[in-house]
Amino acid sequence: MLLATALLIVGLLLVVYSADRLVFAASILCRTFGIPPLIIGMTVVSIGTSLPEVIVSLAASLHEQRDLAVGTALGSNIINILLILGLAALVRPFTVHSDVLRRELPLMLLVSVVAGSVLYDGQLSRSDGIFLLFLAVLWLLFIVKLARQAERQGTDSLTREQLAELPRDGGLPVAFLWLGIALIIMPVATRMVVDNATVLANYFAISELTMGLTAIAIGTSLPELATAIAGVRKGENDIAVGNIIGANIFNIVIVLGLPALITPGEIDPLAYSRDYSVMLLVSIIFALLCWRRSPQPGRGVGVLLTGGFIVWLAMLYWLSPILVE
């Protein structure tokens, strides 16, 4: 059990590291081939924070462990808001200024509702996967359009912050070096995560869904946590919140879409009856906090969000032995 725990932690750290290096390499390649920096920032870099979830979901799907993938998608969205936004608010109260974010928030809520329509029947079908991946393409086109508009106007706070985060150094040799390293590490790391998560789920008599919701989702959300904390400390509030919005959309359309496309079939009914409702509720709370014009969320909100995370985690593990055979 201790060995499986250690290997799971090492695997998650390697997944996060390899995803970061892949994004770094992709940013250099895009810059080299003349893609505007703002589009790189709003697509490659933003999506990069969700790459660990995507990698784990893909590996779990290939091993027909769809509940682990579904749990990772839902759990990451819950954790991004309750834990990561809560901790960021505790570090420093902040306000969302960007009009781009306010245009993306309704899309995040819409996609969250779509997730319910996919999960409610306890089945993931290949048509569900195709539909979700089609939404992913539409979303990418949407943010590219937003990037081009922001580039012309040049006044949006989010776009200024994203440009500041782009890598400034490195040529093609550096990009290909990190690309190769990332592609070598990724399959090994994801296999470590999936295999040892299964071992621990069996040892503690909890479902793969619960393991995905908690341990895997927390581990794969480390990039969002690092981005949010660093963002609010530097006063880059919009990029901290923007990464959460982008990650939550991406988790539904890609991380949930992959198991539906690769390994369609039955899923744990608790994914809809227990976990989806929590995800939708915290998504609505998140949107309301961002739409407010007064300084928000403050430390009081941070305490409530992190407290909500602890309560959710405790109830999840308390109920799991009763609800899971």
Swiss-Prot record:
Keyword Cell division: no
Any one of the GO CC terms: plasma membrane
Pfam families, alphabetized: Na_Ca_ex
NCBIfam families: calcium/sodium antiporter (TIGR00367), PRK10734.1 (NF008005)
Listed transmembrane segments: 6-26, 38-58, 68-88, 105-125, 127-147, 170-190, 199-219, 244-264, 270-290, 303-323
This protein's record includes keyword Cell membrane: yes
Domain of life: Bacteria
Membrane topology, record value: Multi-pass membrane protein
A biological-process GO annotation: intracellular calcium ion homeostasis
Periplasmic side: 1-5, 59-67, 126, 191-198, 265-269, 324-325
Main location: membrane
Localization in the cell: Cell inner membrane
Annotated protein name in UniProt: Inner membrane protein YrbG
Cytoplasmic membrane side: 27-37, 89-104, 148-169, 220-243, 291-302
GO MF entries: calcium channel activity; calcium, potassium:sodium antiporter activity
Record-stated family: Belongs to the Ca(2+):cation antiporter (CaCA) (TC 2.A.19) family.
Record keywords: Cell inner membrane, Cell membrane, Membrane, Transmembrane, Transmembrane helix
Naturally occurring in which organism (per UniProt): Escherichia coli (strain K12)
InterPro entries: K/Na/Ca-exchanger (IPR004481), NaCa_Exmemb (IPR004837), NCX_ion-bd_dom_sf (IPR044880)
Alphabetical list of Gene3D superfamilies matching this protein: NCX, central ion-binding region
